[in-house]
Amino acid sequence: MEGPLLAASLPASAPNSTYIGNQSPRTVSGRYSFGKIHEPLEVPDLLALQTDSFDWLLGNKRWQDRVEASTNGGLAVPTTSGLEEIFEEISPIEDFSGSMSLSFRDHRFEPPKYSLDDCKERDLTYSAPLFVTAEFINGNTGEIKSQTVFMGDFPLMTDRGTFVINGTERVVVSQLVRSPGIYFERVPDKTSDRDTWTAKIIPSRGAWLEFEIDKRDTVGVRVDRKRKQSVTVLMKALGWSESQIREEFADYESMISTLEKDHTSGVEDALLDIYRKLRPGEPPTQEAARNLLDNLYFNPKRYDLAKVGRYKVNKKLGTEEPLSDSVLSVDDIVRTIKYLVKLHAGEVTMPGVKNGQPVDVRVEVDDIDHFGNRRLRSVGELIQNQVRTGLSRMERVVRERMTTQDVEAITPQTLINIRPVVASIKEFFGTSQLSQFMDQTNPLAGLTHKRRLSALGPGGLSRERAGMEVRDVHPSHYGRMCPIETPEGPNIGLIGSLSSYGRINPFGFIETPYRKIVDGVVSDEVEYLTADEEDAFVIAQANAPLDADSRFAEARVLVRAKGGETEFVPRDEVDYMDVAARQMVSVATAMIPFLEHDDANRALMGANMQRQAVPLVKSEAPLIGTGMEFRAAVDAGDVVVATKAGVATDVSADMITTSNDDGTSTTYKVAKFRRSNHGTAYNQQVVINEGDRVEVGTVLADGPSTDGGEMALGRNLMVAFMPWEGHNYEDAIILSQRLVQDDVLSSIHIEEHEVDARDTKLGPEEITRDIPNVAEEVLADLDERGIIRIGAEVRDGDLLVGKVTPKGETELTPEERLLRAIFGEKAREVRDTSLKVPHGETGTVIGVKVFDRDEGDELPPGVNQLVRVYVANKRKITDGDKLAGRHGNKGVISKILPVEDMPFLEDGTPVDVILNPLGVPSRMNVGQVLELHLGWIASRGWKIEGQPDWAKLIPEEIREAPAGSRIATPVFDGAREEEITGLLSSTIPTRDGDRLVGGDGKARLFDGRSGEPFPDPVAVGYMYILKLHHLVDDKIHARSTGPYSMITQQPLGGKAQFGGQRFGEMEVWALEAYGAAYALQELLTIKSDDVLGRVKVYEAIVKGENIPEPGIPESFKVLIKEMQSLCLNVEVLSSDGMAIEMRDSDEDVFRAAEELGIDLARREPSSVEEV
């Protein structure tokens, strides 16, 4: 049995590292791997999904290298780049007479104007100018004018697969759509017991063509989603005579009966009949009818099957048209009809051609949810489609200008208006459903976001319409889309994640690799298969036992055949074998150890919650990993990796310089305390020293949530499974005070606050220290410009940037005019519109950026200055925060106990976390218990004595390990239960010769409060615990007075608006039930929308008087106004029958408010827009 000793991690320079098989040096690490299966293939580049697609669109150097490699027998790569395809497609643009034409060729990019970091700092888009050679040909004179034309700035992808748009990182998600092609379906008829059979020809763009055989056995056709008509009418219109149809379809009753009901005679009659159905109300002429049909299906400008559509049509119908034929042919339509009637008649095959040889094509209905019929539109194609719409809008402009401009004066530059192209690209990146704000909580979140597959978006499904079938796991997802990782909620099953080994072929279908079996020997040769190719083969699992010659060890092998059915077959019938055990799951799921012991629902939560883990102050790689941690962290791009071999010559906190073996030197930047998209700290830390040797792929600096180049999302904590005084009831968690004191679970969060000074109608706003009516101590931390100093500690309400806005001038009195004349402008009225720290936020100012128009910074129109302040705060773990393991075991901290009260082991070590054992059995995520035990074994080290039975699969190299060893237990191929049981009895004892945890994984624990032992032994071990981004500080909220809604005058809702708590219908019933009338009256009036009353109450409280009577709530006045607007004359009567005048007594309100110096109406607006 070959078993790799060490699985994926640290660089090859790590001590004692050993190479295995054909793995490259960078996947070898200090992890002791319990994997038994030899993997012939490394996990491919995890970002290739994004980068390869974008390279194809641009046609850049990397793409050209791949094309060259493919001509030498590598992976098939499309030979024209995406932009080239579009410019070829649109060229030439001709005027209406065809005498002038404009064509495009040879696009090229200039270097970007700003660097990536500049773009992020200045809110710009990281893009490169695109130039195209445009040629104008005057057909009358034969004159050719050629020019290089600027086609706008084209956003560029960063090395990490993201785009920087207006200073923020965004990701374009790949879209899963139904592939163009022909689909045959069988639909049960609701009214009768007969089925209807349909065929749809779906193009990449253009009109659909649908055929159906109904319960009366007549064959109908729908052209462009309009009314149904006889299929024979369409055939006649395409030039078939009645006798030809009879001859071709003589054996099919359905066609003959359809033909007999069809009363059109000849081509003209049929064309006019179709025209009447498609364009009712327009006078039918033969010319118009022929044009209509030609434009619908035979005009390449209007109809496009795309290469993938032609490929699918050829495959389905058994034809061999060239892939460049992107329109339908009459033959395609006739063969489709033939296939449909054969399907209806119950025939199984029809004659076709493959590789020039006649073959029998299977006649069967299609499964729409099969991955052979769903393809991926990745970044390149999505942007290409967008550029195509922009160019076709531009085409219209060019045509118009050709006719209106003087022919002599025309140059390509005067014809072309690039605005529509630029606008459509901008629109896609800014507003498309598929261009998303990058999830940057931690590196895994970013990596998963880039590998996401979405069935939503333009041209895809919508949440409301998608049924159960589309969302369900399908056998063809195996190795292509992860069956585990998908959101909970309305998007379940519509958004997935690409499996670890999946890759995209040139047609957009997902392929997955298999080991080829040659003459009964499982070779290391790997073939990639698409979902419909795979259906033809018999495939064994990765864990099928092999003998020393790489043949199957057992006579019958468990395999899956077509349709995902599993069965045992003789070993000589197997065609392929899985490449790896983790082949079917995504990266995040492959990072859950003992996944094979977890229920799928909980594994789903575990995979999703790893993406919400906040980067901690000190990252720590898991004791129990799966061997995927290194590749995930490096491919996510958040660690700094050496690109050339050499020696580190200069190492500082934010820069590393290496002198390379080839005589060059490379400088690597290290990011310090930047703010991520989600407010977590993005901080990289150098891990090498000056003079260290580095190889290609050596990790030079760790990023957020990485440790030694491995993904490190949480901390290894000592956990005991036991109830404790009911404080861990229902998933609540008890923590030790040690985790607070030692900052074990502390994280740093950075908020960005921004204020701009604009020109207003009354004059410019000003950023200044000179603010009216503000005490000097409030301004203590502001510098002379009025901007807070770096290092200042701030809390809610503190000033960050002083700013004043001119107020509206009133008519001046003579005295004021005199003052104005003497003292100049100084006496002008200004309002304080300073930037203050929002409610509930505290921290330290760590950065200030000032952009000024006068110093040449590009700012939006009307803005003179822009100031950004970065406030960081360290959040220690506290009760109310949410923690989780990797197995979907989540909970909220209910109590933090002093260390001395925590249960402790026999040697006095207190545990860190107490979890409730009842959280395990009903949820069936037993993986957490195995992780706990193996974590204990790893922390203590082990030594296997003798040759016990349970250890026969454990390789010689990992028979012993020191304390604190990191372990890899790959998914579906990890440590077995008997191995864990055995190792528990083989851990290295303490100095006293004791093993604190017995062979059953349980320890004798003592109560920290009394020192008495607990009556039963308790399971204790190390578990990897994550702190999730659901922090109580972001959720807790309280309000006294604050903003009110304009119309109802009730407090706004929600923390963001500094709103109040809603006292709803049911709460009112509760108070009514108790008869608490006064409390209720107070809640509904003076605490809410009795405008006058609430001011008077404030006044009474301030002056220490009795609370006055409540008045009439504003919402009652609104109700009356609404009834009056419905022409109902409503009056309010007092108890003695007199009409009460419902007018607003504003004077009282303002008098009281002015006396008290309060503004109860709304918050002070902080920017001009709010004023």
UniProtKB/Swiss-Prot annotation:
CDD domains: RNA_pol_B_RPB2. GO terms for biological process: DNA-templated transcription. PANTHER family: DNA-DIRECTED RNA POLYMERASE I SUBUNIT 2. The gene is rpoB. It catalyses: RNA(n) + a ribonucleoside 5'-triphosphate = RNA(n+1) + diphosphate. Keywords: DNA-directed RNA polymerase, Nucleotidyltransferase, Transcription, Transferase. GO terms for molecular function: DNA binding; DNA-directed RNA polymerase activity; ribonucleoside binding. The RNAP catalytic core consists of 2 alpha, 1 beta, 1 beta' and 1 omega subunit. When a sigma factor is associated with the core the holoenzyme is formed, which can initiate transcription. GO terms for cellular component: DNA-directed RNA polymerase complex. This is DNA-directed RNA polymerase subunit beta. The lineage of its organism: Bacteria, Bacillati, Actinomycetota, Actinomycetes, Kineosporiales. Belongs to the RNA polymerase beta chain family. DNA-dependent RNA polymerase catalyzes the transcription of DNA into RNA using the four ribonucleoside triphosphates as substrates. It comes from the Bacteria. Its EC number is 2.7.7.6.
